Design a protein with these regions (language model features):
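Short, solvent-exposed aromatic-acidic interface loops
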Residues: 175-180
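Domain-level recognition of soluble alpha/beta enzyme cores
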Residues: 148-174
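Generic beta-sheet signal
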Residues: 4, 125-136
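Glycine-rich phosphate-binding loop signature in dinucleotide/nucleotide-binding domains
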Residues: 38-40, 121-127
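Active-site-proximal alpha-helix that buttresses catalytic centers in soluble enzyme cores
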Residues: 2-67, 103-108, 160
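Short beta-strand scaffold positions
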Residues: 46-47, 112, 132-133
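Short active-site segment of divalent metal-dependent hydrolases/proteases
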Residues: 12, 137-138
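Phosphate-handling substructures
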Residues: 61-116
Length: 180
């Protein structure tokens, strides 16, 4: 069995790749470090987005771990252009995994990307890996573990949020929310 901790970034000021944590988000990042203080971690892997990296900096410092960057943990791009009904499109994308919007990534494509990042770590000897990522891509990884999960679970994610994912085999993955 391999253990993964999947973390959604703390509160941020916007959705761009360069969006930083808010003052509240910075406080949350320190609370997150405290939350993990008694949990053994071997490595931290983050999305390249600024808010994800800032989320894990206090934890990486406390654990004396390097923050590795993996593009596979980047947030899913629903569309490259603004869309008025993005909420409805996002909802539909949880049932129609192959639906795409202009310049965007389907749920299936995004799921494949984050599952590939997970499988790359499964191949290694390292256990107790922490991924820092984003809400939509995180919910797609959880949907991979449990196909009954979807849009409603995405709506319930908090900033930050933490799930433990236990990988026993390709057909046996358990995911559980552990953030209070």
């Amino acid at each position: 069995m391999k253990t993964f901790y999947i973390v959604r970034h703390c509160q941020a000021d916007g959705q761009s790749k360069d969006a930083a944590l808010t003052p509240q988000g910075i406080t949350q990042s320190h609370e997150l470090a405290q939350f993990f203080s008694s949990i053994h971690l071997n490595q931290i892997i983050s999305s390249p987005y600024k808010r994800a990296i800032q989320t894990t900096e206090p934890l990486a410092h406390a654990k004396q771990l390097e923050i590795k960057i993996d593009q596979g943990l980047s947030e899913r791009v629903l569309s490259s252009k603004p869309i008025d009904d993005w909420y409805e499109k996002l909802k539909l994308s949880f049932t129609d995994l192959h639906m795409t919007c202009e310049g965007g990534e389907s749920s299936q494509e995004a799921m494949n990307r984050i599952v590939e990042a997970l499988h790359e770590q499964i191949k290694l000897e390292t256990d107790h890996t922490l991924f820092v990522t984003h809400g939509n891509i995180m919910s797609l990884l959880l949907k991979h573990a449990d196909p009954t999960l979807g849009f409603e679970e995405w709506k319930k994610l908090s900033n930050p949020d933490v799930y433990i994912l236990k990988y026993f085999s390709p057909d046996h993955i358990e995911a559980k929310r552990i953030w209070q």
